[in-house]
From Swiss-Prot:
One of the record's GO molecular function terms: zinc ion binding
Knockout or disruption consequences: Leads to excessive accumulation of lipid droplets and restricts infectious growth in rice. Results in fewer peroxisomes, more lipid droplets, and higher levels of phosphatidylglycerol, phosphatidylinositol, diacylglycerol, triacylglycerol and free fatty acids.
Subunit structure: Interacts with HOG1/OSM1.
Alphabetized UniProt keyword annotations: Cytoplasm, DNA-binding, Metal-binding, Nucleus, Repeat, Transcription, Transcription regulation, Virulence, Zinc, Zinc-finger
Record localization: Nucleus; Cytoplasm
GO cellular component: nucleus
Gene that specifies this protein: MSN2
UniProt keyword RNA-binding, yes or no: no
Protein name, per record: C2H2-type transcription factor MSN2
Length: 548
């Protein structure tokens, strides 16, 4: 299989001065022979099977057409696996580059070489080798110029434009003029108007006019003081004369008195008539009570239909004039009649509101006494309502005020289904046992239920059942017999099962002694915490102690 190629001898001339012959050829060893392998024909990767002969079958392919073998040397030289059919040169000559423009319309696939990207160096992909250029960084962060100390500090400093600043604007706000710098205007005026006594050089004046690119503003012009000040000020279009302000000397004495009472009074500049202070809203408590006591407003609004149609709707000229004043006593008598009729039919919450109004009216501040003479002659609405409430209490028709209740259900309305009533606290219950339990727990302090283990007493049975759960699982020891009974039972053989039952069954262990089980269960039950010492007699709850 393996054939060896003959080695070619190599000779080298060496000089020897000792011998008579000055040069001779020395035989050098040849290189290591290279092994050659015979060419192997290509075999198809997929096997081909013949189809079984049938009427409609065709003869199978005998063999696949072999691919032509190229004249490659048989030596195992490292080469690419798919051998290209034709090699293309990577270098574009100048003669070929000149002919590209004419050949591009005739042949396909001939284009200019692609431009290298910015992230790679020059002539790395398909550009000519003679092209040598530096890559441009895509991000200035990777350029490395940030850490160089030789850069001037003026490069990194932001540019400033003093012309665009609002503080350097020479014109008033909201005026369409050029935004010129004050310093530039002054400098330009000095250049245009040279002083007769000064000895300045004439080179400064034509500097601005000769080179207009030095100044961003237009060519300055001479302006007078009157032209700069006589412009249309937008503030004069909206604001009137400044002298039309409110003067403190024009205030009247009535206004000063109203300001001392902390009441707001508007004063017109043309001496318009003013409204008097409303005496009903002098104190804050009266105003707040009118907002909070909604029951009174409801009772006033829930009158008869005839009263609402006659009194509330009929508003003539006299009533409009008397609107700021308080209502007369006749209207209060009518209100009292309607209120008394309604209070006789309502329940206890109405009485509470009446009593609260009387208490709040008695504790009113002294500001109510400093009212006008008209309001002092007529009683207030709150006093009338409290008097009407007191009259209903004296008659005895109203229900007493409900006391504070104890429990989860705090309903304001009484349930008619609760037929059993407590005589001491007027509390009602649906069942008689609930009433008895209420007597024992609150009034009599009777505790008929007692715990059998710790002796603690309870007034309710459900409390006892809940307490009994704290004494453990309630395991009962199986060893109920005493020591004498256990000794007699052991002597008679009752503690062990008869052994003849398991004599026929092989490898069956004998049952253990039940006496040992009884002792273990008794000890476990004794170690369970929950004795009477763990709980106090006053009923305070404590957590159960656990033993490790």
């Amino acid at each position: 299989m393996e054939s060896m190629m003959a080695a070619h001898p190599m000779y080298m001339m060496q000089y020897q001065y000792d011998n008579r012959q000055h040069a001779h050829y020395a035989h050098l060893p040849s290189q290591q022979p290279m092994a050659f392998y015979p060419a192997v024909p290509m075999v198809p990767s997929t096997p081909t099977y013949s189809r079984p002969a049938s009427a409609c079958s065709q003869p199978a392919m005998q063999s696949m057409k072999q691919m032509p073998m190229t004249s490659y040397p048989s030596a195992m030289t490292p080469m690419a696996s798919p051998q290209p059919m034709a090699r293309r040169s990577n270098i574009v000559l100048e003669t070929e580059a000149c002919d590209w423009e004419g050949k591009r319309h005739q042949a396909h696939g001939i284009y200019y070489p692609s431009t290298p990207p910015l992230s790679s160096s020059g002539s790395a992909i398909s550009s000519p080798e003679s092209c040598d250029m530096l890559s441009t960084p895509m991000n200035p962060m990777f350029s490395g110029l940030d850490s160089i100390e030789s850069i001037k500090p003026e490069v990194n400093s932001p540019e400033s434009f003093p012309v665009l600043e609002w503080t350097s604007c020479a014109s008033p706000p909201m005026t369409p003029v050029y935004l010129n710098n004050v310093n530039n205007n002054l400098h330009s005026k000095q250049n245009l108007r040279p002083a007769p006594t000064s000895s300045c050089s004439p080179e400064l004046a034509p500097a601005v006019s000769a080179c207009p690119s030095l100044s961003p503003s237009p060519v300055p012009q001479t302006r007078s003081f009157t032209s700069e000040t006589s412009f249309c000020d937008p503030r004069n279009l909206t604001v009137g004369n400044v002298t039309l302000g409110l003067e403190p000397a024009s205030l009247s004495t009535e206004t000063l008195v109203a300001q001392a009472d902390n009441s707001f009074v508007f004063v017109a500049p043309q001496a318009a008539p003013t409204w008097d202070a409303i005496s009903e809203l002098e104190s804050e408590e009266d105003f707040v009570k009118g907002l909070v006591n909604l029951d009174d407003s409801k009772s006033d609004a829930q009158g008869t239909r005839t009263r609402a149609s006659s009194d509330a709707v009929s508003l003539n000229f006299d009533e409009v004039e008397a609107f700021p004043l308080l209502p007369t006593a006749h209207t209060h008598s009518d209100d009292d009649c309607h209120k008394s009729k309604r209070q006789r039919t309502c329940g206890g919450p109405k009485m509470d509101s009446a009593t609260n109004e009387s208490a709040s009216s008695a504790a009113a501040p002294s500001s109510e006494q400093q009212q006008q003479p008209k309001s002092s002659d007529v009683p207030s609405n709150e006093e009338t309502k409290s008097n009407s409430g007191a009259s209903t209490n004296s008659d005895g028709t109203g229900l007493p005020a409900p006391t504070s209740r104890r429990g989860r259900k705090q309903s304001l309305t009484e349930d008619p289904s609760k037929a059993f009533k407590c005589e001491l606290c007027d509390r009602r219950f649906r069942r008689q046992e609930h009433l008895k339990r209420h007597y024992r727990s609150l009034h009599t302090q009777d505790k008929p239920f007692e715990c059998n283990e710790c002796g603690k007493k309870f007034s309710r049975s459900d409390n006892l059942t809940q307490h009994a759960r704290t004494h453990g699982s309630g395991a009962i020891p199986l060893n109920i017999m005493g020591e004498e009974d256990l000794a007699a039972a052991a002597a008679n053989g009752y503690m062990h099962p008869p052994q003849h039952m398991y004599s026929m069954v092989p490898n069956v262990p004998t049952l253990p002694d039940y006496n040992s089980y009884g002792k273990v269960l008794f000890q476990i039950a004794a170690e369970v915490p929950g004795s009477a010492s763990d709980y106090s007699d006053d009923g305070s709850e404590r957590k159960r102690k656990r033993t490790d």
